[in-house]
Each structure stands twice: as structure tokens, then as C-alpha cells.
Curated annotation (Swiss-Prot):
Heterotetramer of two alpha and two beta chains. This is Arginine biosynthesis bifunctional protein ArgJ. It comes from the Bacteria. HAMAP family: ArgJ. It catalyses: N(2)-acetyl-L-ornithine + L-glutamate = N-acetyl-L-glutamate + L-ornithine; L-glutamate + acetyl-CoA = N-acetyl-L-glutamate + CoA + H(+). It comes from Thermosynechococcus vestitus (strain NIES-2133 / IAM M-273 / BP-1). Transmembrane segments: none annotated. It is an enzyme of class 2 (transferase).
């Protein structure tokens, strides 16, 4: 049973954080496009970033910054321009962004992290950003989490945010997060971005290790289209403002905090997968029986990323053969005679042999889950995924991955992205 409860507020739920999101004119659509998160005090900062060799200038900047100085006090994020494949001009733009935020807030540029998302190859409109900065900083508030979450959206249909609260040594610890992502989602960190705020006090090396493991179980286990972005970034701040005892070494307290951090990351990851471009439902692939968890996660992610599996789910077609084929090409050796597959609890294969099942019932399950993926108010839901269960043997390894179905709208959205 979890030891926390979900609360409102997103990145500003944790103590000592303010945020803002505004329209700076960076997008032709006039949608919000500039977000800022600020900690009242310097915070321990950890980051996990894309492995794409064409990584964007802000990714290179943040990676370098966190290697030399593991603290930060502000995160600036624009949407509309990725600042990737922009050469020296892009690098200088990142430095200018950090400098203008630092000047406005009164601290060193080294305390500012920068992120971007949008069209690759387009330069950052620095002058528009500079003109908008006074409005952005004036809008900073401890209720600005949702505005910030909306300002980092691109093809996203909904903002993605969460906050958790737990009682801790007679005090309260909170972790908040926001993310964006809808297309070009196949992170290897680690386009997707996630920003996490925490008011616990934790040592830098422990915080980085916690974030890496949390990402391995969440953001690195989602896929929409198999493309790894140039800008994938997860940045987590911990400012110690909860006044709880500092967590300096592994132990019970560190385990509890990591579980809470992982829960935030999993929620945001599932929200990204559900909001995949053109998607109508969330897919959850559960794999068991592997030699270890890493192998299980690899099989799960391969199945979740299969275009044939995704297409079948969109067509509400219980085609288990595509699931079996995807499992077999995951690069994880297993005995085919041990393979078992179930869809929505309906067994379809056991001991490597097909089982008789009612196709109409399986089809009805897929229809039901797709309908439940959008609630009565029209909001997306991550609580009713299409569940695919796969067992590949008798090992103790388990893993989960999330994806979405593949619809005609995915092609339409991406065919018209810059036109």
C-alpha cells in the first residue's frame, strides 16, 4: 500500500517553489509557450537526458551544468522551437536565456537550467523572449503549476501534472511534477520533457541515482512512435524546504523517497503515452518470467512499440500473434514453449500453444477500454489501459511498459506538423 496521497498543485505543490506560464509570441498559434519554475532557495539538481547524438543545445548545456555544479534554482522552458540542429547560434541562445533569467531573478546564470521543445532547426526568438520575461517573472506564484504545464505543450492535447504528499518524521514531504510529450516518444535516457520538484533534503549523488532508477521504470518504458527525441530531458530539484531530516545515504528513508519519486514519474509517463498523437487508448504491457527485471522491461517495451500491435489495438482486433512475434524479436532469449499471452485477462496462449477464446469478448474488451480512456467530461484517463500480459518463463524478472494505439490521425498530425 502506498504511503502517500495525491494532491493538487503540480510543480508548485512542494514547499518553496513558484511557477508561471505565459504566451510570449514564440508560437504562431498564440498558445502559451514560455514556462518558468523557481525555487526560493538553491536546490539539489539531478537530470537524465536523451542519448540521441543530435541532442539539442539546451540538453548539452544542462548536462554540462549538472556535471560541474549539482545545484540549480530555476528552470526556463520554451515550446515552439527545439533549438536542436542550430549550431553555435543555438548554444549562444541557451547562454543568453540563462543570463536573462538570472538577471531578472537576481542570481548567477549557473543556477538556471534551460529546456526547449518544438520544431527542430528553428532558432530561439530571443528578443520576443526577452520582452516577455518581465511578465513571466511577475506571474510567478505558488499556484502557477498548471499555467507552466500548459506553456510547455506542443502537440499535446492536455497538460500533464501530478503532486504527492507523505507524512515524514512528523513533517510533510511533497513531490510535484509536470511533463509534456505526445509525439517523437521513445526515450532512451533518459519530444518529452519532465520537471520534478521536491521539498526533501537529499544528497546530490543519492538524488541522481534515485532519478535514474525512477526513469528506467517510467519514462524509459514508454513509446508512442519509436522515435527518440533530440530534447528528452527529466530534471528534478530538491530544495530541503520541508525541514525533514536530510537523507544522505541509502536506507529506509531513501527507499520511501525513491518510491514516491518513481510514482510521480510513472504517472507522468503514462499520461504521455495516453496522449500520444492520435491515440485513443493507453496500452500497458506486463511481462513476467524473465531472467531479471531488465530483460522483462526490454520485452515489454518491444511489444508496446510494435506498430502491428498498436494498429491491432486501434482496430480492436485481438490479434495475439503480433504480440508473440514482438516478444520473440525483443533480443531476450526464451523458450517458445514457455510463452503465455493474455489480453484483458483472457488467456490466448499457454505453453507456446494457442488457446481457444471468444474473439467477440476480446473485441468487446478493447472497445470498452478505449471508451473508458476518455471520461464523461472528455478528459483523458490513464486508469483504464488495454492490459497485455506476457510470461516468457519461470524467472523472477518482471517489467512493465506503456504505449498507445496507432490511428490514422497520427499520420495526419505528423504529415502536417510544419505546414
Amino acid at each position: 500500500m502506498s504511503h502517500w496521497q495525491q494532491i493538487t498543485g503540480g510543480v508548485t505543490a512542494a514547499k518553496g517553489y513558484r511557477a508561471a506560464g505565459i504566451t510570449a509570441g514564440l508560437k504562431a498559434s498564440g498558445a502559451p509557450d514560455l514556462a518558468l519554475i523557481v525555487s526560493d532557495v538553491p536546490a539539489i539538481a539531478a537530470g537524465v537526458f536523451t542519448t540521441n547524438h543530435m541532442c539539442a543545445a539546451p540538453v548539452r548545456y544542462c548536462r554540462q551544468r549538472l556535471q560541474t555544479k549539482g545545484t540549480a534554482q530555476a528552470i526556463l522552458c520554451n515550446s515552439g522551437q527545439a533549438n536542436a540542429a542550430t549550431g553555435e547560434q543555438g548554444w549562444q541562445a541557451v547562454l543568453a536565456q540563462a543570463d536573462m533569467v538570472a538577471t531578472a531573478l537576481g542570481f548567477s546564470p549557473e543556477m538556471v537550467l534551460v529546456a526547449s521543445t518544438g520544431v527542430i532547426g528553428q532558432p530561439i526568438p530571443l528578443e520576443k523572449m526577452r520582452q516577455a520575461l518581465p511578465t513571466l517573472t511577475a506571474n510567478l506564484s505558488d499556484g502557477g503549476g498548471e499555467a507552466a504545464a500548459r506553456a510547455i505543450m506542443t502537440t499535446d492535447l492536455v497538460p500533464k501534472q501530478i503532486a504527492l504528499e507523505a507524512e515524514w518524521e512528523g513533517q510533510t514531504i511533497r513531490i510535484g511534477g509536470m511533463a509534456k510529450g505526445s509525439g517523437m516518444i521513445h526515450p532512451k535516457m533518459a519530444t518529452m520533457l519532465a520537471f520534478i520538484t521536491c521539498d526533501a533534503a537529499v544528497s546530490p549523488h543519492l538524488w541522481q541515482e534515485m532519478l535514474q532508477r525512477a526513469c528506467d521504470r517510467s519514462f524509459n518504458q514508454i513509446t508512442v512512435d519509436g522515435d527518440t527525441s533530440t530534447n528528452d530531458s527529466v530534471i528534478a530539484l530538491a530544495n530541503g524546504q520541508s525541514r525533514t531530516p536530510a537523507i544522505a545515504e541509502p536506507g529506509a528513508a531513501a527507499t520511501r523517497l525513491e518510491e514516491m519519486l518513481t510514482a510521480v514519474c510513472v504517472h507522468l509517463a503514462k499520461a504521455i503515452a495516453r496522449d500520444g498523437e492520435g491515440a485513443t487508448c493507453l496500452i500497458e504491457v506486463q511481462v513476467s518470467g524473465a531472467s531479471d527485471d531488465t530483460a522483462a522491461r526490454q520485452v515489454a517495451r518491444t511489444i508496446a512499440s510494435s506498430m502491428l500491435v498498436k494498429s491491432a489495438i486501434y482496430g480492436r482486433d485481438p490479434n495475439w500473434g503480433r504480440i508473440a512475434a514482438a516478444a520473440g524479436r525483443a533480443g531476450v532469449p526464451f523458450d517458445a514453449s514457455n510463452l503465455a499471452i493474455a489480453l484483458g485477462g483472457i488467456p490466448m496462449m499457454r505453453h507456446g500453444q494457442p488457446l481457444p477464446f471468444d474473439p467477440a469478448a476480446a473485441h468487446a474488451y478493447l472497445v470498452q477500454q478505449a471508451a473508458a480512456s476518455t471520461d464523461a467530461s472528455g478528459q483523458q484517463s490513464i486508469d483504464h489501459p488495454v492490459v497485455i500480459e506476457v510470461s516468457i518463463g519461470s524467472g523472477s524478472g518482471r517489467g512493465v511498459a506503456w504505449g498507445c494505439d496507432l490511428s490514422y490521425d497520427y499520420v495526419k498530425i505528423n504529415a502536417e506538423y510544419t505546414t
